[in-house]
Every structure is written in structure tokens, then in C-alpha cells.
Amino acid sequence: MATVEVLTSEVVAPAEETPAGAVWLSNLDLAARRGYTPTVYFYRRNGDDEAAFFAADAVRDGLARALVPFYPLAGRLGLAGGGEDGRVQIDCTGEGAVFVTARSGHYALDDLMNEFVPCDEMRDLFVPPTPPPNPPCALLLVQVTHLRCGGVVLGMALHHSVVDARSAAHFAETWASIVRGAPAGDAPVPPCFDHKLLAARPARAVLYDHPEYKPEPAPAPAHAATASTYASAIITLTKQQVGALKAACAGASTFRAVVALVWQCACRARSLPPDKANLFLLYKYISEDWVDIQLNIQQRDNCIYAPTLKANCCFTPTF
């Protein structure tokens, strides 16, 4: 795969003085994968003035202004008390985010978006290289890459201990709004970084069975169906396929119908014996909407739970 040419690399600090101190991280933040989440956004040029489209100065200035309401992203991952055994937190140092500009004379937007599949090569091209995700690392790194067609790829790497995908999208929306001309104080929805809203209760009380937090069961004997190397894939279901699937599931919701199909396929692919093997289904539940509505805020942290369903591998072949 071809490379891109890096033009500039700098650290962009908030445009104004921001609050100092530390932001406490909840158990949900600490349970998240400690690492950077890469995201790429594709933009087509919306006019004839190529120089003005995604002009580096305007994007850099917008980033500095967006970091004012999102000031924790300009900080560094830290440890409470400064010792090696301290609880992980955000140190609001105001140091800034890494900002990289680049260009590619090889790629056009259509080259990248035709049958787009996330891959390591795509990340290496359009997302800045990240440091080890441990204190005192930066929390936000961005790269703006101009393509030969005039389009732009915006790549971001955000530390997952600090924000999740919804929070990252909120930041990108705010940044874009500012670049289009909105004042920094007019963020679409002001963020809330009080992670203590999700603090655990003082006395632990486990009211339900949570297999996702229990030790993993002993692995089944390896065979051809389970010993192979894992692979990632994006499987697209058309509207017609989903409709037929839901009809076969007696009017079940899209989520339930697709999950049922995945469950059956997993059982078959692993050649699990019916009624003698448990299959665990883990899915993500985002509670930010509930928190936002209940407290009338826009919570910005990891409001993600991973409930797990467990059942015997038993099915009637219907698909």
C-alpha cells in the first residue's frame, strides 16, 4: 500500500485557559480497553476553492477552540497521587492534542470508499502513530490528509479510557461546528466530564447474575472448528434480507432476528454438540442516552455496559 507524506506535526493547546486539576475516572472507564480508538472521516470537496477546503490554519484554530469545552482531551493520562500504584485519572494539564497534516498524491476518495473495510493499513496511512497508552500519554491525536482528488481524510486517535465512540462523535461534531463559524461556547451540546456520576455504590450489592464478570469456563477440547485463527469481517445485510429474516422469526425486532442468526451460525461453525455446550453472547449497551435524559446533561465518558447471555447450544436448523 502506498504511503502518505507528512507535512507538519505539532501540539495544539486550547485557545483559552482551561480548568486545571484532575478528572476522576469511573470503573466503566477503567474497565474499557486501555488504548487508542482509531476513527476516520471522509470529506468530499464542496466547492472549487481547493485551498480553502479544510485549510490547515482553520482546522487547527478550530481544534484549539474545541479543546476549550473539551479541555480534558488537552490533558494527559495520569495517576492519582503521582505514584505507580495510584488510580488512573485525567490530569488536566492543558498541554494540548497532537495535530498532523499530510497529503497523498496516490489516493482519491473513491479509491478508499469503494468496498471500504477497516484495516491496519488504513490506520497506518490516515491515523497518527500513537504512543504507549499509559501515563503520561496524550489523549487525542488527529491527522488531516489531503487527497489527489481534493477530498480529505480526517483521522483521529482518542484514548478509550477517557471517551467512547459516542463521546468522540460529540467532539467531532463540536469541532466541525466551530470550523464552520460557530463560537466555541456554542457547542451543539456542552459536554459534562463529571465521571463521578457513575461511581459505584459504597456497599457492593450484586442483584443479578453477571456471567460476563465471572472467570471464563475451561476451554473445550480443540478441534478444527475452534483452533483456527480468528479473522474480522464486515457482513452487510440488505433491507430485503433483514425483512425476510424478521418474517422467519415471527415478527421479532431487527436486533433479535440478527442476533438469533449469528447465534445459530456460531453454533454450526464451532460444531458444538447440542445441549452439551454453553454459548455466550456478549453485546454492548450504551446508557448515555438514559443518563443524559435523567440528568439533563451530555455525559462524556464510557457509559457502556457489556451484558452477556448464556444458553445451551440447541437449535432447529431453519436457515
Curated annotation (Swiss-Prot):
Ordered alphabetically, the record's keywords are: Acyltransferase, Transferase
Q: Tell me the InterPro entries matching this sequence.
A: CAT-like_dom_sf, Plant_Fungal_Acyltransferase
Any idea which residues are catalytic in this one? 160 (proton acceptor), 301 (proton acceptor)
The entry sums up its family as follows:
Belongs to the plant acyltransferase family.
Coding gene?
A: PHT2
Pfam families attached to this UniProt entry: Transferase
> What's one GO MF term for it?
acyltransferase activity, transferring groups other than amino-acyl groups
Q: What does the function comment of this entry state? A: Hydroxycinnamoyl transferase that catalyzes the transfer of an acyl from p-coumaryol-CoA to putrescine, to produce coumaroyl putrescine.
> Under what name is this protein listed?
Putrescine hydroxycinnamoyltransferase 2
Q: Could you name the domain of life of the organism this protein comes from?
A: Eukaryota
- EC number of this enzyme: 2.3.1.-
Q: Which organism is it from?
A: Oryza sativa subsp. japonica (Rice)
